[in-house]
Amino acid sequence: MSDSSSCDSNSDNDINNAVPKKVKRRYKTGLYKDYETHFRDNLSWVTRSKWDSFTSYEHQLAFVPESSNFSNLNNEQNRDCCIRSENNCDMRMNNNEASSNNSTAIRSPEYKPDLNIEDTFEYNEIIHINNEDEDKENEDASSVEDNSEDDDKHMSESSSNGYDSDNNEFDSDDYDANISDDETNGSFDDNTIMFEKTNLTIRDIMTLIMGFSIRFRLSDLGRQKLIELIKLIAGPEFKDINISKYRLQQRFDPPDDKINYHYYCNSCNKEILYSISKLNFKNYIKTCSKCDTNNKITLKSTNYFTSINLTYQLKMLFESPYIKQEIFNFINSVTVNQCNVDSTKIMRDVNDSKLYNKINNRNTCYLTYNISTDGAPLTNSGKRGFYPLSVQPNFVSPISRFKQILLCGILTCTKEPTSDIAQLFFSTFIDEAKLLYENGIEVTNLKNESIIVKFCPLAYCVDSVCRPILQNRMQFNGYYGCSWCYHPGCYVKEVSGIRYPLRDIDPELRSHESHLKDIKTVTLSNKRQERGVKGNTALIQIPCIDIVWSFSFDYLHTILFGIEQQLYNKWTCPKSQSMFKLRNADVKAIEKRLLSITPTQDIHRLPRSRKEKLKGAEVKTWILVYSLPCLEDILHDTALKHYSLLVRILYTLLKTTITEEELVQCEYDALKFVGYYQVYYGVESMTFNVHILLHVVQSVRQTGPLWNNSTFPFEGNIFQLKQLINGPNKMDQQIARKHLQQLHFKTGNVNYSSNIIKNYCTDIFRHKNLSTYFYCGEDVVFTGASYSKKIDGQYCRVFKKCIYNGKVFHSIKYTKVKRTNDTMIQLKSGHFGRIIDIIEKKTNAILHFQKLLHFQKILLL
């Protein structure tokens, strides 16, 4: 007898262990109430067998664990479970009478089930139970998945990646994993007052917690500890309040249809096989119509990319009062400029470019935006990287447009994507871009009138590696690799590569029409390429695109990390053969000058040694501000004058106001710089970056100033997106979800219950404000403490610091800063001086300064 009972006990334990705890929990909480109706046909035979054994085992125990009391469970939940138990027992009565009898015997005789109980779950809230089990059957589907798992394991074990070793801290987008045992019992009312003196409800606290967590990028563990702290402060009556991740996601997550996942063929990479949102995910086997390959699609498949609804994000911008005001101010300013055409053709913004005027050369006014994509590693040591598809709105002020970068898609992969994958990645964006161009979105203007606003892409801001992939052309290291002209390139044996020297006859410029002609030639003749064009591209379908000149000049990678770095290496590298090579003593003298500079606060990064790996902003500051003073009298005059041409080109094209005469001068300077570059440094130095400097002015004419079409804001946004990752699991999904959550709070698209909550959440997403300030007129703000001083027989207030037109000035008496200097000024007369005092006299701001005459000599040099 004892042997048989122990044998039964062991078999029961085997059945109990065969079913994951998550499945048991969901079964008990009512998620599988209609299992036989909805799910049985969708299960694999392995999962179905486990489930039948588990349900039979649960009927025998009547859902009463030996170590727990039946009365401790929620009444409605127990009632519901017993109903399911009775129904399932009836189904198996013929085959398992003993189980049914045991179940009836154990069940409490006083209990009478309520057959009219309402179901607290809808069908669309139920997740399929076979995801985790069927995925386990396919763990060895591909080596790419194994590599991904290895990277994730290494990431979770490595402290260098910034993650704690506690797995509870990792974020998870698993919908079911976030449902706790009592999520569905409605154990508390969100409108219950939690803090009486401030009249804050539980709903308010949840909003504050979510806003705080998003702003300061708390992990799941950090947010949970914050919740525990708040409950501790609230008092013992709120100890059992369950503010779980599931409840927060239900309230603050974006709608499920705004983030979709697109699975493509893993063999040919030429067709999207399946597109679905995460909530409605099912395992499928899809056959590719291009290569007839069967692709198994599971939750662990890596051959997919994510799309985020752009229309949804644009509507959020218009729902923000502050951003809406900026948008309509921009529209009005563009309308005024179009009515008052300036004969001097001054370039101020994108609305002065040729492509913008071509787009808006109709009755409809289109708001434009820039597009960019670039790769970055997801982790410090892993192989996987991600390519975000980002959008920069051009219809707000220049300061705001760089802060409102929108996210349209994410592609994750272990190597650089091919042109075929890039076409698929852009295909979903192209469909939405067409709808925004043709139909637009319905918004309200400042008068609260309903209007239709339409959008059109203007410029594509990508580097020289991504550009040919999107255009489906040869790269810069091949023949006909130039993006904007038909320079064939020539092979230079000394460097074993393609170079682009000046030619006797200038190469023909590319155009949209000539590119289409090359595509047609390749298609009809089955050639590998025609003048660098390898075939068709999906981007041709984007409205109003110029497949050549819509791709703007990228000065970050071309000039800052390209030409400038190449020149500096020729001057300072020990292996350099240049005639302008510097001695070690000269290099040290340049370093000494550089590190002794105390810049203004407009320059956010202090000078660093050129031996270190500099950021793009630091190289930009070096070229525009530091280089000429540091190189003077050290670098040969011929090389310095040649280098100063590059400085003048970059300075002019980054101005906020550029005249046509200045553009013509830049064209001449660029031609002169490239020509002498070949003379001074040889044909082997005529790289692609040097060659395309000849096209920079034409690119500015087509798409607008360099400052608006650079990749700087997109590179900065990539860094911000990486900060949204709090764990190694499903990192792309974390980025997409948290980006939309962050945009909700930034634009005020949150259902606030009071102004107190709204003001707090709005304030934490703003930059730090001045604590002590005093306005003097419209343009001057005095900051900090002041003291009285008698000047010309009258007492005046004297300050040490002020802000004029957004620029910080301080006197020599301001001693808090050591490595920056904002005391120097230049008058309109050309004189230089140093500020002694900043005086407020009868609502006027007066600067008492000391004239510095020795600056005149340096200016003449």
Predicted regions and their residues:
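Acidic, metal-ligating active-site segments
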Residues: I346-R362, Y366-K415, H487, P629, ...
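Cys/His-enriched microdomains
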Residues: N260-N266, K286-S289, Y480
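N-terminal alpha-helical interaction blocks
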Residues: F121, S159, D166-H262
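Structured nucleic-acid-interacting core domains from mobile-element enzymes and related host factors
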Residues: P254-S267, N303-G385, I451
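Polybasic, low-complexity terminal segments and linkers that are predominantly intrinsically disordered
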Residues: M1-M194
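Domain-level detector for long, ordered catalytic/regulatory cores in large eukaryotic signaling
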Residues: Y274, K278-Y284, C291-T335, K434-G616
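Terminal interaction-prone segments of large eukaryotic proteins
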Residues: D3-N10, E86, K112-D114, I127-N130, ...
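Short, conserved catalytic/metal-binding motifs centered on acidic residues
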Residues: L226, D374, F429, Y460-C461, ...
